């Protein structure tokens, strides 16, 4: 059995209101997190909500990083999904939680695209 990708889902608490509510800072941190993990960036799209909050995605060759922030709660929901063996999603997750000044993080990893032996043989995995 082999997985096509690794998906880290992070619940990030106790973050700086100012950072989570600043679209430029959130985008910069997410882009740098992707680069810290060794990913190749393809597209970046972020949106600022009123009265507060930021959502965005960094599309990488290896998949994506996504975020939704609730600055008033000091909370961010973060996904880091990478395909292949070259990029470690935990490197990106560690970087961004540090930069958001998180007090607490609950993260889990799930395997995506688990390929069983019959499928693996069909596609030479």
Swiss-Prot record:
The modification Pyruvic acid (Ser) is found at residue 63. Belongs to the prokaryotic AdoMetDC family. Type 1 subfamily. Heterotetramer of two alpha and two beta chains arranged as a dimer of alpha/beta heterodimers. Is synthesized initially as an inactive proenzyme. Formation of the active enzyme involves a self-maturation process in which the active site pyruvoyl group is generated from an internal serine residue via an autocatalytic post-translational modification. Two non-identical subunits are generated from the proenzyme in this reaction, and the pyruvate is formed at the N-terminus of the alpha chain, which is derived from the carboxyl end of the proenzyme. It is an enzyme of class 4 (lyase). It catalyses: S-adenosyl-L-methionine + H(+) = S-adenosyl 3-(methylsulfanyl)propylamine + CO2. This is S-adenosylmethionine decarboxylase proenzyme. Pathway: Amine and polyamine biosynthesis; S-adenosylmethioninamine biosynthesis; S-adenosylmethioninamine from S-adenosyl-L-methionine: step 1/1. Catalyzes the decarboxylation of S-adenosylmethionine to S-adenosylmethioninamine (dcAdoMet), the propylamine donor required for the synthesis of the polyamines spermine and spermidine from the diamine putrescine. HAMAP family: AdoMetDC_1. One of its GO terms (biological process) is spermidine biosynthetic process. Its cofactor is pyruvate. One of its GO terms (cellular component) is cytosol. Binds 1 pyruvoyl group covalently per subunit. Its EC number is 4.1.1.50. Keywords: Autocatalytic cleavage, Decarboxylase, Lyase, Polyamine biosynthesis, Pyruvate, S-adenosyl-L-methionine, Schiff base, Spermidine biosynthesis, Zymogen. The active site is at 63 (schiff-base intermediate with substrate), 68 (proton acceptor), 83 (proton donor).
